[in-house]
Amino acid sequence: MASKSSISPLLLATVLVSVFAAATATGPYCYAGMGLPINPLEGCREYVAQQTCGISISGSAVSTEPGNTPRDRCCKELYDASQHCRCEAVRYFIGRRSDPNSSVLKDLPGCPREPQRDFAKVLVTSGHCNVMTVHNAPYCLGLDI
């Protein structure tokens, strides 16, 4: 029969291993400039404007060359972000409702920012870029901030 004194160190070791495992599983930081580019998903602006308002913001014809379409460029940026940081990249891209200047998205003639924000929230989903996120699925929670 095990004594109390031999169980306590074993329990302590188990707890410490669990805490260490949880700490290492939290992944990288996801801040603009630290874990994310300074302007996350800047390349998605064209795709979002095209899909929400049918306009081009680049001032030139939109490429239809495979691998170089606005969607392709946007999805590549999302794919290049670490899985752990993709939702945070979308959060930075759409900005906060309380601070309109925090968004990469801009009000454009005939294309207000709100429809762009609504569309950008689904960029990670299977109907668009289909990239896995921190949730191990192609979706992000809590983007209505």
Curated annotation (Swiss-Prot):
Subunit and partners = Subunit of the tetrameric inhibitor.
Mind naming one GO cellular-component term on file for this protein? extracellular region
Say which family it is in.
Belongs to the protease inhibitor I6 (cereal trypsin/alpha-amylase inhibitor) family.
Miscellaneous comment as given in the Swiss-Prot or TrEMBL entry: CM proteins would be involved in the cooking quality of pasta.
Instruction: Name the InterPro entries for this protein.
Output: Allergen/soft/tryp_amyl_inhib, Allergen/tryp_amyl_inhib_CS, Bifun_inhib/LTP/seed_sf, Bifunc_inhib/LTP/seed_store
What is the annotated tissue distribution of the protein whose record heads this document?
Endosperm.
Q: Where in the cell is it found?
A: Secreted
- What SMART domains does the annotation carry? AAI
Q: Which residues form the signal peptide?
A: 1-25
Q: What is the recorded name of this protein?
A: Alpha-amylase/trypsin inhibitor CM1
Q: What does this protein do?
A: Alpha-amylase/trypsin inhibitor. It could be involved in insect defense mechanisms.
- Kindly state which keywords UniProt assigns to this record, in alphabetical order: Alpha-amylase inhibitor, Protease inhibitor, Secreted, Serine protease inhibitor, Signal
Primary location class: secreted
Q: Does the keyword Ribosomal protein apply?
A: no
Q: Name one GO molecular function term.
A: alpha-amylase inhibitor activity
The cross-references to Pfam families, in alphabetical order and at most eight, read: Tryp_alpha_amyl (PF00234)
